[in-house]
Amino acid sequence: MPTISQLIRKGRKTVASKSTAPALKECPQKRGVCTVVKTTTPKKPNSALRKIARVRLTNGYEVSAYIPGIGHNLQEHSVVLIRGGRVKDLPGVRYHIVRGALDSAGVADRLQGRSKYGAKRPKQK
């Protein structure tokens, strides 16, 4: 424990919190271009083929981003919007692609949680 005079001389250092999405550079979203679109398998004990894309951002970073929802229209050179948010069972994937923005189409036939997947409200009869 420091003495009063040590505190007067040096003071306390504030601990800077580490960003969970450093490639965004404090922005809410960033635009980027898909370089690779592929599937990967999650960590144990889960089993699936998760859809991910490697995205080169406008600030020069290249990151892996998860493609949420069932089915997608993304391919190489698609322009996408990414947001922060990791996928717990995919190591190294710390970003999500925003569905329904730029070249990424919304999820078809989605009725619940539509705003998260860029799906329009279905027509009423």
UniProtKB/Swiss-Prot annotation:
Q: Which residues carry this modification: 3-methylthioaspartic acid?
A: 89
**Gene name per UniProt:** rpsL
Q: What's the protein name?
A: Small ribosomal subunit protein uS12
Q: Which domain of life is it from?
A: Bacteria
Its Gene Ontology biological processes? translation
Q: Which GO terms describe its molecular function?
A: rRNA binding; structural constituent of ribosome; tRNA binding
Mind telling me which GO cellular component terms the entry cites? small ribosomal subunit
Q: Which NCBIfam families match?
A: rpsL_bact (TIGR00981)
User: Entry's InterPro entries?
Assistant: NA-bd_OB-fold (IPR012340), Ribosomal_uS12 (IPR006032), Ribosomal_uS12_bac (IPR005679)
Against Pfam families, the record matches this protein to: Ribosom_S12_S23
- Keywords tagged on the record: Methylation, Ribonucleoprotein, Ribosomal protein, RNA-binding, rRNA-binding, tRNA-binding
Role of this protein: With S4 and S5 plays an important role in translational accuracy.
Query: Partners and quaternary state?
Result: Part of the 30S ribosomal subunit. Contacts proteins S8 and S17. May interact with IF1 in the 30S initiation complex.
What CDD domains does this protein's entry cite? Ribosomal_S12
Family, per entry: Belongs to the universal ribosomal protein uS12 family.
Q: Which residues cross the membrane?
A: none
What SUPFAM superfamilies does the record tag this protein with?
Answer: Nucleic acid-binding proteins
